[in-house]
Curated annotation (Swiss-Prot):
The keyword Ribosomal protein applies. InterPro entries: Ribosomal_uL14 (IPR000218), Ribosomal_uL14_bac-type (IPR005745), Ribosomal_uL14_CS (IPR019972), Ribosomal_uL14_sf (IPR036853). One of its GO terms (molecular function) is large ribosomal subunit rRNA binding. The keyword Transcription regulation does not apply. SUPFAM superfamilies: Ribosomal protein L14 (SSF50193). The lineage of its organism: Bacteria, Pseudomonadati, Pseudomonadota, Alphaproteobacteria, Hyphomicrobiales. It comes from Methylocella silvestris (strain DSM 15510 / CIP 108128 / LMG 27833 / NCIMB 13906 / BL2). This is Large ribosomal subunit protein uL14. Belongs to the universal ribosomal protein uL14 family.
Length: 122
């Protein structure tokens, strides 16, 4: 469950290391984002010579949350940290690699490019 001012790790090689959520997209009064939702983020920490730099405002897809994800079969999945993948305006990932596992709920949200780049889908 991601809301404004939440800090997230970046799970790709775009050059950003940490980002902060500044808006949850999808409705004027929407407060929280979950896995697969698109948010607007500000880059708070970046590596030198990366594709993005500190202070950039970008869109991102939430790929991992510490909050439980409940599945239809009754199972629950949760991650140790909150993480996102930076995307461009065409909803394509900026990085060419994804780090760490991603949940299969992204498939239902039409994030197939992220699913195909991920090393493990849970």
């Amino acid at each position: 469950m991601i809301q404004m001012q939440t800090n997230l790790d970046v799970a790709d090689n775009s050059g950003a290391r940490r980002v902060m959520c500044i808006k949850v997209l999808g409705g004027s009064k929407r407060k929280y984002a979950g896995v697969g939702d698109i948010i607007v983020v500000s880059v708070k920490e970046a590596i030198p010579r990366g594709r993005v730099k500190k202070g950039d405002v970008m869109k991102a897809v939430v790929v991992r949350t510490a909050k439980d994800i409940k599945r239809a079969d009754g199972s629950v999945i949760r991650f140790d940290s909150n993480a996102a993948v930076l995307i461009n305006n065409q909803a394509e990932p900026i990085g060419t690699r994804i780090f760490g596992p991603v949940p299969r709920e992204l498939r239902a949200r039409n994030q197939m490019k992220i699913i195909s780049l991920a090393p493990e889908v849970l």
